[in-house]
Amino acid sequence: MKKQPIGFMDSGVGGLTLVKEARKRLPNEDMVFIGDQARLPYGEKPAATVREFAWQMANFLRHQEIKALVIACNTATAAALPDLQAQLAIPVIGVIKPGSIAALQTTHNRRVGVIATTGTIQSAAYSQQMAALNPDVQVTGLAAPQFVTMIEANQRHGQAVQTIVNQILQPLQKSEIDTLVLGCTHFPLLTTAIQTAVGPDVTLVNPAVQAITMLEEVLTQQQQLATTTPGTLRMYTTGSVAAFEEIAQQWLAQPDLTAQQVDIQKEKNDGPDR
C-alpha cells in the first residue's frame, strides 16, 4: 500500500511550528507543507477571502494525495475549518480547539490570555471554544499582527525585538492571566521574547503540541499511522523560496532543507470531495 503524506498549510512559515512537533512525535510520517507567503498576512483579510485562500491551499495538498490535513494557521482555522471538514473526505484538524484544551488544562486561576492575529481575535474563536469547554474561564484577547511581520522577516532575537514585544504585550500586564495561548502558529518562534515580556508566572501554551496529539489519535483510530520507514518532508511556498528556506532551515535545524515555489491559484480545482 502506498504511503500517503500528511498535509500542513499556513499563510507563511508559522505552520512549521506544527511540522516540527509532528516530525518529533511522528517520525515515520511523510509530510507536505504549503506556506502562502505571497498573500500573507491572513489576519488582516476578510473571513471570506481567508476561506478562499484556505481552499486553494487544501486543493493543492489534496493533489499530493494526503491522508489528513492540518490547518496550521489560527486565522484559517477560525474562518475555514467547518467548510474544509465538510468539503474534504479526509480528517481535517485545526489548532483552536487543541489550543483551548491545552490552555484549560494549564490554567489554575481560570484567567487565560490569547495573542493572535486581528482576524482570530475578532472572530472570538478562542473565547467561544473555551467558554464551551468551561463557562467559568475568563479570556483576554490581544491582537499582535506585528509579530507575524517580524517573524517572516526573521527578526526573532535581540534587544530591539524584545522592546517591541514588551510594548505590544503591555496591555496584558494587569489582566492577572496565568496562562497565555500563542494563538498564531508564527508566535512560538518568538517564545523567548514573549516569555520575557509576560514574566515567569505566566505559562505559555503552544497549540501545536495538543494538535499533533489529536492528529496522532485520529491516524491511530483509522489505522493509518506510519510505523516503518523514516518520514520525508516536502515544502512549498507561494512566495520567496530563499526567505522561506532561511527560516525553515533554522527552525527545523536542518541546513539542507529546500522548498519549491508554486502557484496554487493555477492548481486544477475538481471541487469538493463531497
UniProtKB/Swiss-Prot annotation:
Listed Pfam families: Asp_Glu_race
Gene that encodes it: murI
Cross-referenced HAMAP family: Glu_racemase
Pathway: Cell wall biogenesis; peptidoglycan biosynthesis
Active site per database record: C73 (proton donor/acceptor), C184 (proton donor/acceptor)
Alphabetical UniProt keywords: Cell shape, Cell wall biogenesis/degradation, Isomerase, Peptidoglycan synthesis
Positions of substrate binding: D10, S11, Y42, G43, N74, T75, T185, H186
Record carries keyword Isomerase: yes
UniProt feature coiled coil, ranges: none
Biological function: Provides the (R)-glutamate required for cell wall biosynthesis.
InterPro entries registered for this protein in UniProt: Asp/Glu/hydantoin_racemase, Asp/Glu_race, Asp/Glu_racemase_AS_1, Asp/Glu_racemase_AS_2, Glu_race
Taxonomic source organism: Latilactobacillus sakei subsp. sakei (strain 23K) (Lactobacillus sakei subsp. sakei)
SUPFAM superfamilies: Aspartate/glutamate racemase (SSF53681)
Catalyzed reaction equations: L-glutamate = D-glutamate
Identification of the protein by name: Glutamate racemase
EC number: 5.1.1.3
Record has Transcription as a keyword: no
GO molecular function, one term: glutamate racemase activity
Matches recorded under PANTHER family: GLUTAMATE RACEMASE (PTHR21198:SF2)
Biological process per Gene Ontology, one example term: peptidoglycan biosynthetic process
Family named by the database record: Belongs to the aspartate/glutamate racemases family.
